[in-house]
Amino acid sequence: MSFTGERKGRLIVFEGIDGTGKSTHIGHLRKYLEEKELEVVQSFEPTRGRWGRMLRDSAVTGRLSVEEEVALFLKDRREHVKMLIAPALARGAWVLLDRYYLSMMAYQGARGIDPEVIRAANEEFAPVPDAVVWLDIPVSVALERIGNRGERDAFETEAGLAACRSVFASVHAPWMLRIDADAGKEEVAARVRKALSMRFPDVIGA
């Protein structure tokens, strides 16, 4: 079984280990698409819903077991798809997400759950992205950027980030767009647009 909802819009996901600048580049793309008078819906995961708040709280109050995390992520994503993602795609909007189930594959995969099992569980109900913009930077650069913003969470160690990055690197699909994000913001934005222009030449110019 897989997502069978109506799909007139496009789903673009920004992924990467912490410190890659996902929110910055989602903002650039949103502005570009809105200037073309397209409807854009921007969101993130985990959400601010009931299940997402539990996941966020766990990062502060103490980690849940990986099995508990997986269960909560699936509940949060089901609600997200039903309430926001699917309706937006059905009416023709461009949906831009800061993280999606590839992050779950990477982060919970790094804690011992088979990433392909996670992928299969999600694709039973969640729409496959039209494009994933994987902002890739070396772990050392990510740690430097994270250090500049303050406290780290449980995954923000060299070993943790390296494990997550290796999962992202293992995903091979036509919609997976690797972007070298170890550069200035304007240069990375140009690389993102060029990659997306090849995926959506009728809408996005290089």
Swiss-Prot record:
Binding residues annotated for ATP, in chain numbering: G16, I17, D18, G19, T20, G21, K22, S23
GO biological process, one term: dTTP biosynthetic process
UniProt-listed InterPro entries: P-loop_NTPase, Thymidylate_kin-like_dom, Thymidylate_kinase
GO molecular function: ATP binding; dTMP kinase activity
UniProt EC number: 2.7.4.9
GO cellular component, one term: cytosol
Enzyme class: transferase
Alphabetically ordered keywords of this record: ATP-binding, Kinase, Nucleotide biosynthesis, Nucleotide-binding, Transferase
CDD domains: TMPK
Catalytic function, reaction form: dTMP + ATP = dTDP + ADP
Function noted in UniProt: Phosphorylation of dTMP to form dTDP in both de novo and salvage pathways of dTTP synthesis.
Family, per entry: Belongs to the thymidylate kinase family.
Stated name of the protein: Thymidylate kinase
Source lineage: Bacteria, Pseudomonadati, Verrucomicrobiota, Verrucomicrobiia, Verrucomicrobiales
